């Protein structure tokens, strides 16, 4: 206790000294353990059975207590005493859903501020803290149970947290169940899971299953476990199965084996529609769960002579490369390549004899740009034309957002002095239609585009050619694909960049740029419009490829000089700001196409015979 004494003796007037009023003083009393002392006094009252003003009536016992303690500790009791409730005036409340042991444990905690949570009593404390709305105790129980989640109790904890409204425990238990789903779905506890919790499990991208077929089997098994009461839920659960990721054979088998159940629950037509969808647009759905897919980096290069082609893929999981069979991709000079689902789209380019090297291509006197769009299906090793763009274009960029392919910038057919295109188009792979969207705010050359959720960022230069060829990076646009709106951002990079020497990549919905001239990586904060230095990589060739995958950036190949091309591959781990070198490409390359693509494991065309 700290005590400051006032030396003045008059309360209503100031003292004087030789006719001069003295300065008035203040008293401050601070007792750091005041609250604990009050608790101790109240606990003494409880032990002495004095000053009680309220009673909790149990089935087998009446427990006296103090209103102030109940109201201070429990939102349930505070609300009861604040509102004009019968219990407030009667001075008692009857509680039937808690045991006397639980209520006494609560009162011990309320009067002392102390309790011990154990494996034996945690559920009791969790129940009473939920009912009596004791937030601190509820959080303590939740934290205790989160640390104990395992394969034996996770389903029970998921159910408990759902019943008691503990968001934190529910989220942790749900994540654990989703991660170990394939080990749990055959258990008895799983079959007793309620509809709402099962629905939350199934809708997650992170559901860890080896194939989507397992999700369909789980839905059917859970429904049949108590068919009479659960069949009404089947249409809702079927919607959570990504039916278009299943094979046609699997869907046909489901129709044959479950015809009666599907028809009685109005799900037969849902499966029929999925079969039509798979037949007509199989491989064009990018929503496969990560656990059901294999991810690759796809590399393609056509030499200047237009005849020699090099195509290979890198398996992310196994850190291994595979040289792919001849695909005969028609990648014209100045064309752009983007992946979508299990397909690859090539747009535009020059039909004439333009040089492929960007430095020489840009200086050609005439560009015979095409409006053609090609689709490559690696599963069938098939390459075919789809709908043409509205405007021929070359030296543009393409990127996927909101399940559509956007083509941005570039130049159309004509002489070299034609300005860059402002027109922007988007292609729907399912409807096979091109539409025009809002145009660019102004012209841009050497565009680099990356998608972060629904936003497309485009970086480039406002000039095409400078004396040193390397134009500065001075254009920075943002396009909201959901609202079809462009905005121009201030390119405050903090230092000078060359437009042709940076690579823009998305990592975990954050935009990064890799500067191939200074070997540095920067991330962009959309709230402040500021670029932040994230670290440096050891080296990188000019014209290297760059790809963002999950929390990693891959930088591949490139050239240090016309006759010095590298096959090196470096990986930047953004979550720990570290670089490492992984398996090199099968061949040294510069100025090549580089995209991420993934396949359902059951139809992965590149899985076997991977070579390091």
Swiss-Prot record:
Keywords: Kelch repeat, Repeat. Residues 52-119 form the BTB domain. Kelch repeats lie at residues 291-337, 339-390, 400-450, 452-502, 548-595. Gene3D superfamilies: 1.25.40.420, Kelch-type beta propeller (2.120.10.80), Potassium Channel Kv1.1, Chain A (3.30.710.10). The keyword Cell cycle does not apply. It comes from the Eukaryota. Residues 150-250 form the BACK domain. This is Kelch repeat and BTB domain-containing protein 3. The lineage of its organism: Eukaryota, Metazoa, Chordata, Craniata, Vertebrata.
């Amino acid at each position: 206790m700290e005590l400051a004494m006032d030396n003045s003796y008059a309360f209503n007037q100031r003292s004087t000294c030789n006719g001069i009023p003295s300065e008035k003083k203040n008293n401050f009393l601070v007792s750091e353990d005041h609250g604990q002392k009050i608790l101790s006094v109240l606990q003494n009252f409880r032990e002495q059975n004095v000053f009680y003003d309220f009673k909790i009536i149990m089935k087998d016992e009446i427990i006296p207590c103090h209103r102030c303690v109940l109201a201070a500790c429990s939102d349930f009791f505070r609300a009861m005493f604040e509102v004009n409730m019968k219990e407030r005036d009667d001075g008692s409340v009857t509680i039937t859903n808690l045991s006397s042991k639980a209520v006494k444990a609560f009162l011990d905690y309320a009067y002392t501020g102390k309790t011990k949570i154990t494996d034996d009593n945690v559920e009791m404390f969790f129940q009473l803290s939920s009912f009596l709305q004791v937030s601190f105790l509820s959080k303590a129980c939740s934290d205790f149970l989160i640390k104990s989640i395992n394969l034996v109790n996770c389903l029970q904890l998921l159910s408990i947290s759902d019943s008691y409204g503990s968001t934190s425990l529910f989220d942790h238990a749900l994540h654990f169940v989703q991660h170990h789903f394939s080990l749990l779905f055959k258990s008895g506890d799983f079959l007793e899971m309620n509809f709402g919790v099962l629905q939350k499990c199934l809708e997650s991208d992170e559901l860890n299953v080896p194939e989507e077929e397992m999700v369909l089997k789980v839905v059917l098994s859970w429904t049949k476990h108590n068919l009479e009461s659960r069949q009404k839920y089947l249409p809702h659960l079927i919607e959570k199965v990504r039916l278009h990721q299943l094979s046609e054979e699997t869907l046909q088998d489901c129709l044959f084996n479950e015809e009666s159940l599907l028809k009685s629950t109005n799900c037969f037509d849902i499966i029929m529609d999925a079969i039509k969808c798979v037949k007509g647009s199989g491989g064009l759905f990018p929503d496969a769960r990560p656990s059901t897919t294999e991810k690759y980096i796809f590399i393609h290069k056509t030499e200047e002579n237009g005849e020699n082609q090099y195509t290979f893929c890198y398996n992310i999981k196994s850190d291994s490369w595979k040289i792919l069979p001849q695909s005969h991709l028609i990648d014209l000079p100045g064309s752009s390549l983007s992946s979508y689902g299990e397909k690859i789209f090539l747009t535009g380019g020059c039909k004439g004899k333009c040089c492929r090297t960007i430095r020489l291509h840009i200086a050609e006197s005439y560009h015979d740009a095409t409006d053609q769009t090609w689709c490559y299906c690696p599963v069938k090793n098939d390459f075919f034309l789809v709908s043409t763009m509205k405007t021929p274009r070359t030296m543009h960029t393409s990127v996927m957002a909101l399940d559509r392919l956007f083509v941005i910038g570039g130049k159309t057919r004509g002489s070299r002095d034609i300005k860059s295109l402002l027109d922007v188009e988007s292609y729907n792979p399912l409807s096979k239609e091109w539409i025009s969207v809002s145009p660019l705010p102004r012209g841009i050359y050497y565009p680099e585009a990356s998608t972060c959720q629904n936003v497309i960022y485009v970086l480039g230069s406002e000039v095409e050619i400078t004396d040193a060829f390397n134009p500065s990076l001075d254009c920075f646009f943002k396009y909201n694909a959901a609202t079809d709106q462009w905005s121009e951002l201030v390119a405050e990079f903090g230092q000078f960049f060359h437009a042709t020497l940076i690579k823009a990549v998305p990592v975990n919905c954050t935009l990064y740029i890799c500067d191939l001239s200074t070997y540095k990586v920067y991330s962009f904060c959309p709230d402040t419009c500021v670029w932040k230095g994230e670290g440096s990589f050891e080296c990188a060739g000019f014209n290297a490829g760059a790809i963002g995958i999950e929390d990693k950036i891959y930088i591949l190949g490139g050239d240090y000089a016309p006759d010095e091309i590298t096959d090196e591959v470096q990986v930047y781990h953004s979550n720990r700001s570290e670089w490492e070198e992984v398996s090199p490409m099968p061949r040294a390359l510069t100025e090549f196409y580089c995209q991420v693509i993934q396949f359902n494991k059951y139809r992965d065309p590149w899985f076997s015979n991977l070579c390091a």
